[in-house]
Amino acid sequence: MSSKLVNSLRLTFLSFLGIVSTSLDAMPAGNPAFPVIPGINVEQKSACAFDLCNSYDVLSALSGNLKLCFCGDYIFSEEAQVKDVPVVTSVTTSGVGPSPTITSTTKNRNFDLVDCSLSANCVAAAFSLPDRTMSAIPLFDASFEVKIGGLKQYYRLPMNAYRDFTSDPLNSESEVTDGLIEVQSNYGFVWDVSLKKVLWKDGVSFVGVGVDYRHASCPIDYIIANSQANPEVFIADSDGKLSLKEWSVCLGLTTYVNDYILPYVAFSVGNVSREAPDNSFKKLEERFTNLKFKVRKITSSHRGNICIGATNYIADNFFYNVEGRWGSQRAVNISGGFQF
């Protein structure tokens, strides 16, 4: 393939990523060449360098290579919704006497997260199987990674997203109150699995794809309800668990810059869902005389992010990676580790 055609394909791919990502949120993509970066080039005795096409590591030559890493993922804001919530828009009272007729008018609404943040810290092990052929479309060049660690969440949501207007009829329109629910968790257990594969390479550039799944269960630290009638109702609850399930698929491109730095750009799409525990909101109900709650899933579907990052080797077989992502999600991912 001519160099002019290759450069045109790279430019087209980068332009496509830039266009489609502006309207769309997902997990970190990582470097598309992650499965084939072996670490140290032993021909350079005094410096670390990328050796993307050949490896002199015995373990890598025989069976692959192993990476042990630390990973931190920090989400500063995220867009998500509680969808199709039946909400009372008006209450009409007719008739006289001790039992008047009360009619409520309802309408389905979507509620957006007002604020959301997430912090995850994990240790990871990744096994990679490089392809030793010079084929542009490799058979192997794949890696499998497992992460375990701790994850903490916080979000604020309009109170009516968790209201239950069906269990007890409202007596007046004044009970159709609005406000905010704040939920903060402690660190809970999180696990994450991912699979990455190089689809195409020419020794300088790589196109890769990745699939990632994350699952977390975090103990509730506190829940705060703010409304017009009740300025602040606070409960602390460590029994309930706030769950998070997330998956994403990414496609990325990386191009060789020098012997130490490998920058990349990727596009990632996926889905996330959060669900608070029923028992925690039952405790919150006990603090109110006229409010009932129903827990609903918070979802962010068909999400997309543009991911830009770089991988750097700063010592023998030691690397670190920094990635930022923008879209419906604003986040930073930092990872580093040793390769064997």
Curated annotation (Swiss-Prot):
A family per Pfam: Chlam_OMP
InterPro entries in the record: Major_OMP_Chlamydia (IPR000604), OMP/PagP_b-brl (IPR011250)
Stretch forming the signal peptide: 1-26
Membrane topology: Multi-pass membrane protein
GO cellular component labels: cell outer membrane; pore complex
Keywords, in A-Z order: Cell outer membrane, Ion transport, Membrane, Porin, Signal, Transmembrane, Transmembrane beta strand, Transport
Compartment annotation: Cell outer membrane
Predominant location: membrane
Single annotated GO MF: structural molecule activity
TM region(s), chain numbering: none
One record GO biological process: monoatomic ion transport
Domain of life: Bacteria
Protein family membership: Belongs to the chlamydial OMP family.
Stated name of the protein: Outer membrane protein B
Species annotation: Chlamydia muridarum (strain MoPn / Nigg)
